[in-house]
Structure formats: structure tokens, C-alpha cells
């Protein structure tokens, strides 16, 4: 898995902060917890020790994952671009022709996607269909429930 990963600036900074917290706070704390649990004697029936070792495994795994992800990541900077088409990182307002409702999505990476926050993955059916389209374009998207048709009514690079 050596492919590069596009991230928004917000997501990149969030991953960096999580990595710093794990290395500077969580790792030393779990090492201290292991030492304290070890001081209680018999490790074969020491639930505190087992829990701390499990937590240490999780923390070390997450540190590895974040280091790998950040090493392959690049930040998509939209600040110098004219918002004339849908690209990774753009915020798009759509008009759903069937429901006659407006929907706003931000096109993000897979790790950032959260439909409740209006963030959809660039690899999702809707995300893939929207990328490259311009203002006032009509876009048909095949979704599990059938085909949806949207009109792009606004594009922002935030």
C-alpha cells in the first residue's frame, strides 16, 4: 500500500495532532501503567497488566498507521484555484431533482468521510460522479437505491 493519499489541510493537521498526542502522552502513560501493574506481582492473573499491554499494542499500532499515512499523504491546497469545477476538497451544493431539496457535500478522502457532517469520500459513487463537473452541470449518479440526478448549484473552495 504505497499509493499517495490526498488529504484536506484540516485532516492532515488532525492526524499530526493525534500522532503527537499518542507519542507524547499516551505511550508514556501506558508504559507507566505497565510498570505499575508489573509491581503488583504475579503477571499470570494480573488484569491491570493485561489491559495495559493490550492498550500498548493498540497505541503502537495506531502510531505505525499514522506514520505510514502521513508519509504518503499530500495536502490538497485549493487557495489559489478558481472554484469553477468540483475537485477534491471542494464544497458542492446540489439540487436533487427528485426530492427538490438542496444538499451540500464536501469532497474528502476516505478517512475523512462522514455523511452526518456532510463529508463524502472522493471514491464514493456520488463523489466520483461529481469530480470534474462544473457549475450548472446535471449529474446522474448510480446509487444502491437506483439513479439519482443532481444539478450543481454552487461550488466553493474552503
Swiss-Prot record:
UniProt keyword annotation of DNA-binding present: yes
Protein family membership: Belongs to the GreA/GreB family.
Name of the protein this chain belongs to: Transcription elongation factor GreA
GO biological process assignments: DNA-templated transcription elongation; regulation of DNA-templated transcription elongation
Top-level lineage group: Bacteria
Single Gene Ontology MF annotation: RNA polymerase binding
Biological role: Necessary for efficient RNA polymerase transcription elongation past template-encoded arresting sites. The arresting sites in DNA have the property of trapping a certain fraction of elongating RNA polymerases that pass through, resulting in locked ternary complexes. Cleavage of the nascent transcript by cleavage factors such as GreA or GreB allows the resumption of elongation from the new 3'terminus. GreA releases sequences of 2 to 3 nucleotides.
Keywords: DNA-binding, Transcription, Transcription regulation
Gene expressing this chain: greA
DNA damage as UniProt keyword: no
Protein source organism: Pelobacter propionicus (strain DSM 2379 / NBRC 103807 / OttBd1)
PANTHER family, A to Z: TRANSCRIPTION ELONGATION FACTOR GREA
InterPro entries reported for this sequence: GreA/GreB_C_sf, TF_GreA/GreB_CS, Tscrpt_elong_fac_GreA, Tscrpt_elong_fac_GreA/B, Tscrpt_elong_fac_GreA/B_C, Tscrpt_elong_fac_GreA/B_fam, Tscrpt_elong_fac_GreA/B_N, Tscrpt_elong_fac_GreA/B_N_sf
NCBIfam families per UniProt: greA, PRK00226.1-2, PRK00226.1-4, PRK00226.1-5
Amino acid at each position: 500500500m504505497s499509493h499517495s493519499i490526498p488529504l484536506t489541510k484540516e485532516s492532515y493537521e488532525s492526524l499530526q495532532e493525534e500522532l503527537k498526542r499518542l507519542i507524547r502522552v499516551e505511550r508514556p502513560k501506558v508504559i507507566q501503567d505497565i510498570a505499575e501493574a508489573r509491581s503488583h506481582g504475579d503477571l499470570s492473573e494480573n488484569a491491570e497488566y493485561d489491559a495495559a499491554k493490550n492498550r500498548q499494542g493498540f497505541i503502537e499500532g495506531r502510531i505505525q498507521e499514522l506514520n505510514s499515512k502521513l508519509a504518503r499523504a499530500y495536502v490538497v491546497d485549493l487557495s489559489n484555484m478558481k472554484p469553477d469545477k468540483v475537485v477534491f476538497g471542494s464544497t458542492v451544493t446540489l439540487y436533487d431533482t427528485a426530492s427538490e431539496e438542496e444538499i451540500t457535500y464536501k469532497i474528502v478522502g476516505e478517512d475523512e468521510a462522514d455523511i452526518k457532517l456532510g463529508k463524502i469520500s472522493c471514491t464514493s459513487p456520488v463523489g466520483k460522479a461529481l469530480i470534474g463537473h462544473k457549475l450548472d452541470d446535471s449529474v446522474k449518479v448510480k446509487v444502491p437505491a437506483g439513479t439519482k440526478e443532481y444539478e450543481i448549484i454552487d461550488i466553493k473552495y474552503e
